[in-house]
Amino acid sequence: MAVTKLVLVRHGESQWNNENRFTGWYDVDLSEKGRSEAKAAGKLLKDEGFTFDFAYTSVLKRAIHTLWNILDELDQAWLPTEKTWKLNERHYGALQGLNKSETAEKYGDEQVKQWRRGFAITPPALEKSDERFPGHDPRYAKLTDAELPTTESLALTIERVIPYWNDVIKPRIASGERVIIAAHGNSLRALVKYLDDLGEDEILELNIPTGVPLVYEFDENFKPIKHYYLGNADEIAAKAAAVANQGKAK
């Protein structure tokens, strides 16, 4: 049976991950730890014999720079890459820039958990006059008004991620190309929910650690056979738990 593989990587720790702030579409860069995580991910992939034919990433530098570091470790800096806003992080609306723990102290752990991990719940929306609204950013100049979010739930994130998966990424993989996707916690949660057919309660508890390669294997009918992280299982579990704890009051 022919097995097709796909590699997903959440960007390495960003400067705002380090500061425990809601990031969303704000274009913050990797921290030093994040760059190290990305390089370690590339080394893991190299050690496991992975090479790629094509890469996808978002238009946010923390994902782009994660991909660059991975490809540098693989000696594949030349790899053809498509950047798309459809793989951006979920837009966190008016929460963008706020400290997660301080927000939890103000609104409660459960409310912040729902804002962070709930399926159909949107954080408070931005006003379009707010400088954080993506309509003011030239990289989104070609997006329609309907495509420019003032806030997003995971359900809304799925509405842009999954059509892009089905229309663009999946056909490339089905043609035999080896693909890596470097993206974000929630755009990858959207894809994982779809691939694994997870329920709303299941996706609420799913936390994807930064900078750890997640490998999916598919059968000839493009059904997932299994998925697994590369690396030390205990370290990966600890990183996922740390992600879950970011939204709790101190």
Curated annotation (Swiss-Prot):
> Which residue positions are annotated as catalytic?
H11 (tele-phosphohistidine intermediate), E89 (proton donor/acceptor)
EC class, as a word, reads isomerase
SMART domains per record: PGAM
Q: Which UniProt keywords apply?
A: Gluconeogenesis, Glycolysis, Isomerase
> Could you confirm whether the keyword Isomerase appears in this record?
yes
User: Can you state which reaction this protein catalyses?
Assistant: (2R)-2-phosphoglycerate = (2R)-3-phosphoglycerate
Pathway(s) served = Carbohydrate degradation; glycolysis; pyruvate from D-glyceraldehyde 3-phosphate: step 3/5
What is this enzyme's EC? 5.4.2.11
A GO BP entry is:
glycolytic process
Site features described as Transition state stabilizer, chain residue numbers: H184
**How is the subunit organization of this protein annotated in UniProt?**
Homodimer.
User: What job does the chain carry out?
Assistant: Catalyzes the interconversion of 2-phosphoglycerate and 3-phosphoglycerate.
Q: Which family does it belong to?
A: Belongs to the phosphoglycerate mutase family. BPG-dependent PGAM subfamily.
Q: Per its UniProt record, what PANTHER family does this chain match?
A: PHOSPHOGLYCERATE MUTASE
| HAMAP family the UniProt entry points to | PGAM_GpmA
This protein's name: 2,3-bisphosphoglycerate-dependent phosphoglycerate mutase
The source organism is: Yersinia pestis
Q: Which gene encodes it?
A: gpmA
